[in-house]
Amino acid sequence: SVSKLVEITDAVPLDSSRVAVRFDDGYSGVLDMSAYLRDWPAYRKLRDPSFFATARAGLGTVIWGDGSIDVAPEVAREEATPLGA
């Protein structure tokens, strides 16, 4: 059977490196992007707190700015720590 890809239905920036995310399977968690900001040139723009604050749900994942920066929902699902943990 083909497993359904998880999608992000809600995303809210918490601070300058973390986003609260909700998935369509009911899971909610916090995605810490600090390692991405530090290690990945593609995410360098997110080091600007005002740009990071544009985080929102879109296209089934978390997007920033005009949508040209995103994070794969399956990666977010794997890395998000449960809310309240």
Residue positions per predicted region:
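Motif-centric detector for short Cys/His coordination patterns
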Residues: 1-85
